[in-house]
C-alpha cells in the first residue's frame, strides 16, 4: 500500500515537472523549418537571375528552372 502511494506521488511530481518546463519554453523555440531557412540564408549567398543552377551550385535568390538550369526571380505581384 505504501509503495503504491509512493509510486503515484512520484508519477504526479514528474508529470507536474514536465508541465512546468514545457510551459516555460513556450515561444523560445522557433519552428524547425524556419530555423533551417534562416541558417541557410545567413551562411550562403544566393545566385542572381540568369546564373547557372544545378545540384552542385549555390542556391538561387528566386528559384531554379530545372529544365533550363537557370536561376529565375520570383514574379512580383
Swiss-Prot record:
Which organs or tissues contain this protein? Answer: Expressed by the venom duct.
Q: Which GO terms describe its cellular component?
A: extracellular region; host cell presynaptic membrane
- Disulfide pairs here are 46-61, 53-64, 60-71
Q: Name one molecular function that GO assigns to this entry.
A: toxin activity
Q: Name one Pfam family in it.
A: Conotoxin
Quick one: signal sequence residues? Answer: 1-22
Q: Which domain of life is it from?
A: Eukaryota
Compartments reported by the entry: Secreted
Question: What does the UniProt keyword field contain?
Answer: Calcium channel impairing toxin, Disulfide bond, Ion channel impairing toxin, Knottin, Neurotoxin, Presynaptic neurotoxin, Secreted, Signal, Toxin, Voltage-gated calcium channel impairing toxin
Supply the InterPro entries for this chain.
Conotoxin, Conotoxin_omega-typ_CS
Q: Does the keyword Secreted apply?
A: yes
> Propeptide residue ranges?
23-50
Query: Could you tell me what this protein does?
Result: Omega-conotoxins act at presynaptic membranes, they bind and block voltage-gated calcium channels (Cav).
Q: Which family does it belong to?
A: Belongs to the conotoxin O1 superfamily.
Its UniProt domain note says: The presence of a 'disulfide through disulfide knot' structurally defines this protein as a knottin.
Protein name per the record: Omega-conotoxin-like 6
The organism's lineage is: Eukaryota, Metazoa, Spiralia, Lophotrochozoa, Mollusca
Amino acid at each position: 500500500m505504501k509503495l503504491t502511494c509512493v509510486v503515484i506521488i512520484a508519477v504526479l511530481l514528474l508529470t507536474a515537472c514536465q508541465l512546468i518546463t514545457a510551459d516555460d519554453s513556450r515561444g523560445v523555440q522557433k519552428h524547425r523549418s524556419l530555423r533551417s531557412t534562416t541558417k541557410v540564408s545567413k551562411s550562403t549567398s544566393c545566385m542572381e537571375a540568369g546564373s547557372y543552377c544545378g545540384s552542385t551550385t549555390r542556391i538561387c535568390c528566386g528559384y531554379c528552372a530545372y529544365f533550363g538550369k537557370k536561376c529565375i526571380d520570383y514574379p512580383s505581384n
